[in-house]
Amino acid sequence: MYINTLFWKQNPTGDKKNQEEKMQKTLLSCLITTLLLITVADSMKDTSVRLKLAHRDTLLPKPLSRIEDVIGADQKRHSLISRKRNSTVGVKMDLGSGIDYGTAQYFTEIRVGTPAKKFRVVVDTGSELTWVNCRYRARGKDNRRVFRADESKSFKTVGCLTQTCKVDLMNLFSLTTCPTPSTPCSYDYRYADGSAAQGVFAKETITVGLTNGRMARLPGHLIGCSSSFTGQSFQGADGVLGLAFSDFSFTSTATSLYGAKFSYCLVDHLSNKNVSNYLIFGSSRSTKTAFRRTTPLDLTRIPPFYAINVIGISLGYDMLDIPSQVWDATSGGGTILDSGTSLTLLADAAYKQVVTGLARYLVELKRVKPEGVPIEYCFSFTSGFNVSKLPQLTFHLKGGARFEPHRKSYLVDAAPGVKCLGFVSAGTPATNVIGNIMQQNYLWEFDLMASTLSFAPSACT
C-alpha cells in the first residue's frame, strides 16, 4: 500500500450545482492493494481459487478535500518503502472498485473462522499481513462488522514466547511484550502511508470459493485480530488481504496449494460496486487464451513488492531522456506494481520528462489549480477536447515487452470539469510505483514459479 488518491466520478445529468454535489460524493482513492483466496487439501483437483474484486471508492462518498489527504498518504507510503506445486484448481474472488465507499482501493470479500463470517477487505499487493476488525476477548458495540474470536472454533493465538513471534514475525511488526507465557503475540502493524493496525496474531481458517464453483477451507492461515486501526487506507473496509511476496501472505498460502500463479483484472476505478472482476489463484482460462506480453518479475530486488525491470518511457514514437539509474534498483531506483497505490509515482527525473511531455499536447486547455488537489498538472477540461490527441504513453520493459496504458489511465478526472495528469513526483532517488489506475483494464498474471509478469488489455468482464 503505497499511495492513496481521490478522483471525481462525472455525472452527466442534472444542473451544475447538483452535479458538483454528486461528484463530491464519489471520490476515488488508492486501491490497493490486497487479494482473497480459498484453499483446502480435500478439494485440490481441477480447481482454482476465484475472488471478486471491487474498487474501494464504490463504497462511501467523500468530499474533495480528501484528495489532499490521500496524496499525502501516498507520499508517506512511498517514503517507507515459490511455490512449486501446480494444480488445475484455483481460488476465485470477486474484485471491484471502492468508489461507492469513497476510496480508490479495490475490495474483495473473505470468510473467516468456524463458522465462517464474511468480511470486506482491501486487496493489497504491498502488504504481508491479512487482518480483520476483531475482538479477542473484549466485548463492546461496533459500528462495523467485527470478528469475535471466542465464537470461532478454529481460532488459535500465536504465543508471545514462541520463535514465530520473537523472530519470524518481526517484519510484521510483532511486539516484545510478553507478561505471561499464555499471552498472545501482539503487533503494531505500520503502513507507509501512516495507517496502522494493532492486535494479536492467530492461526485461523479462511473459506474461499473455487473456480469449479465449490467452496474450500484454508486452515491454519496466519491472520491479525485487529482490535484497533487508524488511517484512510481502511475507509469502508473490515480489514486487509495481504498479497505481498512473503511467507505469511495470503498469496503464499493459496499458491502453495493451487499453483504458483495469481491474476487479476482491475475494472475502471470509476465503476460502481455492481461491476466487478475476479482475483484468481491458480489456473485461469482467461490468462491461457488472452494475447499476452511477458517480462521478468523480480521477487527479490525490492521485497516484499513485485518489481519489474522498466528500461524507459516513450510518448508516441519519442523515447524520453530519462537517466538509466532511475530504473536501477541497486541505485535506489527500480519499479514496482502496487494495487494499494492509486496514482503512479515516478522518480523526479522521469516525472518531469513525462508530465512536461504530455502537457505540450494540452496547451489549448487552461491550466488550473483546483483547491485541495495536490497534483501539479491539472486542466480545465471541455467536452470539445479529443483525448486521442494525447500521445500513447509506453513503459518499455526488459525482454522487449511494452505496457501501453489507456489514455484515461494517465489523464484522470480530479474535480468537476477538471482533469489532471495522474502522476506524482517520488523524489530522488526513489522507487517508481505503477499504481492501480494505470493498471486498470488490463489482465495481469504473476507467475511466481517462472518469475514472470504477463499482461494484456482487457475489458475485465
From Swiss-Prot:
Induction: Expressed with a pronounced diurnal rhythm characterized by a peak at the end of the day and early night (at protein level). Slightly induced by sucrose (Suc).
Subcellular location, principal: plastid
Keywords attached to this entry: Aspartyl protease, Chloroplast, Glycoprotein, Hydrolase, Plastid, Protease, Transit peptide
The keyword Ribosomal protein appears for this protein: no
Enzyme Commission number, as recorded: 3.4.23.-
InterPro entries on file: Aspartic_peptidase_A1, Aspartic_peptidase_AS, Pepsin-like_plant, PEPTIDASE_A1, Peptidase_aspartic_dom_sf, Plant_Aspart_Prot_A1, TAXi_C, TAXi_N
Pfam family membership, one: TAXi_N
Active site: 124, 338
One GO location term (cellular component): chloroplast
Subcellular location(s) of the protein: Plastid, Chloroplast
Cystine crosslinks: none
GO molecular function, one term: aspartic-type endopeptidase activity
Residues of the Peptidase A1 domain: 106-456
Protein task: Aspartic proteinase that can use azocasein as substrate and regulates endogenous sugar levels (e.g. sucrose, glucose and fructose) by modulating starch accumulation and remobilization. Influences general morphology and development.
Similarity section: Belongs to the peptidase A1 family.
Name under which the protein is recorded: Aspartic proteinase NANA, chloroplast
Gene: NANA
